[in-house]
């Protein structure tokens, strides 16, 4: 399935039904009073969060959503039927923003949480509504009102509690594949991962914790370079960031600084999040080098540095224990 995390759509609520002009014409009431009914309300457009969805793909080609119009009134003071509301299902974590003003209209983070965006137009009045002592046979009616029209941007921000970040080829996908049931594409070259991968990791108490492998972070990501800018938003909701560094990289310290700088430039509180610094692929370096580079990283980051081998599943228990302590 294609991963789409942004979509601009137009939401059009239904028009209210018109009122009608009608008079009672019964067998023994040849000159009855006004009986024209009111029109029904137009349908509204409602967004609803759904746990079963993980992408905004449905809105890639369907950019205009139109709710049903209300029906016109009927004789004998019968009101027209209201238009059916249109309910659009979106993934949990979808933020809705008014494109014209930039104002955030809502943030749907829980299953079945809903938000009415475009409200249907009110139905018009039939002539029975205008009956008065001064006018016993009104012939006035009103048309239904137009429904609201909104142009909105949908932006999906994943609801993972733990975000795995790092330069391409640091081993993020391998890590999420060995600690969860996720099965991302893995290969020994940069940019294998082109979309965020999600995996549920079971804690000791049996409860699940959602991890996300965030792809494409390189120098300049916060400014739109590479793939990273599109995906940095997905770590805004995380509680903890696991910063994975390739132990066999040419300069692991420089790699660490690149990601830290991108978090700082992007802003939005990313640099304030709890971060666990992890050296990966330790099976490919000797012990002396590992001790030296770990110490330098600790001095640079002012944080404890964990060492793991995702491929050999070494050090993973210590890493997960550290994660559970901080959630």
Swiss-Prot record:
Class in the EC hierarchy, top level: hydrolase
Keyword Magnesium (UniProt): yes
GO molecular function, one term: magnesium ion binding
EC number(s) reported in the record: 3.6.5.-
Protein residues bound to Mg(2+): 173, 193
Keywords: ATP-binding, Cytoplasm, GTP-binding, Hydrolase, Magnesium, Metal-binding, Nucleotide-binding
Binding site for ATP: 166-173, 191-195, 213-216, 280-283, 309-311
Pfam families: GTP1_OBG (PF01018), MMR_HSR1 (PF01926)
All residue ranges annotated as the OBG-type G domain in the record: 160-327
Location in or out of the cell: Cytoplasm
GO biological process, one term: ribosome biogenesis
A cellular-component GO term for this protein: cytoplasm
InterPro entries, per the entry: G_OBG (IPR031167), GTP-bd (IPR006073), GTP-bd_Obg/CgtA (IPR014100), GTP1_OBG_dom (IPR006169), GTP1_OBG_dom_sf (IPR036726), OBG_GTPase (IPR045086), P-loop_NTPase (IPR027417)
Cofactor(s) demanded: Mg(2+)
Residue ranges occupied by any Obg domain in the UniProt entry: 1-159
HAMAP family linked to this entry: GTPase_Obg (MF_01454)
Family: Belongs to the TRAFAC class OBG-HflX-like GTPase superfamily. OBG GTPase family.
PANTHER family: DEVELOPMENTALLY REGULATED GTP-BINDING PROTEIN-RELATED (PTHR11702), MITOCHONDRIAL RIBOSOME-ASSOCIATED GTPASE 2 (PTHR11702:SF31)
Quaternary structure and interacting proteins, as annotated: Monomer.
Role, per record: An essential GTPase which binds GTP, GDP and possibly (p)ppGpp with moderate affinity, with high nucleotide exchange rates and a fairly low GTP hydrolysis rate. Plays a role in control of the cell cycle, stress response, ribosome biogenesis and in those bacteria that undergo differentiation, in morphogenesis control.
Protein name as catalogued: GTPase Obg
Originating organism: Prochlorococcus marinus (strain AS9601)
Lineage, broadest ranks: Bacteria, Bacillati, Cyanobacteriota, Cyanophyceae, Synechococcales
Gene that encodes it: obg
């Amino acid at each position: 399935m294609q991963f789409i995390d942004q979509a601009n759509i137009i939401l059009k609520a239904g028009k209210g039904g018109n009122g009608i002009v009608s008079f009672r014409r019964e067998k023994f009431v040849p000159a009855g009073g006004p009986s024209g009914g009111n029109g029904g309300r137009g349908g509204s457009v409602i967004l609803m969060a759904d746990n079963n969805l993980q992408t905004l793909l449905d809105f890639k080609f369907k950019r205009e959503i139109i709710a049903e119009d209300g029906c016109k009134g009927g004789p004998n003071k019968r009101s027209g039927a209201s238009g059916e509301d249109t309910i659009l299902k979106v993934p949990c974590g979808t933020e809705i923003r008014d494109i014209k003003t930039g104002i955030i209209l809502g943030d749907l983070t829980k299953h079945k949480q809903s938000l009415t965006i475009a409200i249907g137009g009110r139905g018009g009045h039939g002539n029975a509504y205008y009956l008065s002592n001064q006018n016993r046979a009104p012939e006035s009616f009103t048309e239904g009102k137009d429904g609201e029209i909104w142009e909105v941007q949908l932006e999906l921000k994943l609801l993972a509690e733990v975000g795995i970040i790092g330069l391409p080829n640091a081993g993020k996908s391998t890590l999420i594949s060995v600690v969860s049931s996720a099965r991302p594409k893995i290969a020994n070259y940069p940019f294998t991962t082109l979309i965020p991968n999600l995996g549920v990791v079971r804690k000791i108490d049996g409860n699940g914790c959602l991890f996300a492998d965030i792809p494409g972070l390189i120098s300049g990501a916060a400014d739109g370079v590479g793939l990273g800018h599109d995906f940095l938003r997905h770590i805004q909701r995380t509680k903890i960031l696991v910063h994975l560094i390739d132990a066999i990289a040419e300069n692991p310290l420089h790699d660490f600084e690149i990601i830290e700088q991108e978090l700082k430039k992007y802003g939005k509180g990313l640099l304030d999040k709890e971060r666990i610094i992890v050296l990966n692929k330790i099976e490919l370096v000797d012990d002396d080098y590992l001790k030296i580079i770990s110490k330098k990283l600790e001095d640079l980051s002012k944080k404890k540095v964990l060492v793991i081998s995702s491929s050999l599943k070494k050090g993973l228990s210590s890493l997960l224990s550290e994660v559970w302590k901080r959630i």
